[in-house]
Amino acid sequence: MSILGTYLETAMTDPIIPTSQLVTTTPLSQNPAVVYLARLTSALSKRTMRAALDKIAALDGQDAFTLHWAALRYQHTLAIRARLAADYAPATANKLLSALRGVLKEAWRLGQMSAEDYQRAVDLENIKAETLPAGRDLSFGEIKALADVCMNDPSPAGVRDAAIIGVLATCGVRRAELASLRVEHFETDSGKIVIRGGKGNKDRTVYATHGALDALLDWLVLRGTHLGALFVPINKGGSVQHERGMSAQAVYKMLVKRGLEAGVKEFSAHDFRRTFVGDLLDRGVDIATVAKLAGHSDVKTTARYDRRPETTKCDAAGKLHFPYHRRSSW
């Protein structure tokens, strides 16, 4: 019996549709999963939600395109929610639930579900939990150490990597967004960088200033200002390769390499983003502006990176004293 079937057997006494009927023979043109993914505007969203649907379908031994989504009823989706809550962090589980709701909506639009069955099936609360954002903050000293190893590298890679780290640290861009930047997205006079097709297929503007702008301008001297990918590979001989841009994976590998050289403990590209948001909020920038710079559609997401409540709690704890002093000797 499938995992979903086991959940239904233990959680539901009279399922409307046995899981053996959850396999579809619907043509792809009428498959709600195919239609749902086709409606998504960015390639990243398509990949993310395809993976989400595959995870849900795997509960019944299917994939996104073989599960009979239109046959799901409330007892099925409730069992799915229970399994997701048990297996995934709340944010991940809720993303999977969002994909589930989306594909069921397409099943209703295609006339494969009645309005009543659809409304009941998607009547699921998100999984609630108060969790800290993943990752860690990078200190100014750590960022400086990363910049220093790049500046001490006389090769073209040193110049390029300093520019990449500068953009990550001061613009809060996502790794995939950085990899997709093009020269025509960057204004050398103002430092303005236009992020095209970010998460949710949203465009936004960020600004490289001070040292980050200087690093970018130095990189353009080596790279040249002709159109194309802003950050490109450099071969072992030190030659700049203009044929293609750096991949997000190449950016990741570069950061690992520079982190080891700088003696900085393990970090990710997203930790620059986390630090960027937290630092701006610490400096009193209003949360709506920070959300726009970070590309957050909801300021609640931005608020999760706000370190000030922790500072307030730490200050409050400091008002309590325990009458003990370190011993001078043992």
Give the ranges of each region predicted by the language model.
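Conserved catalytic core of the tyrosine transesterase superfamily
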Residues: 2-330
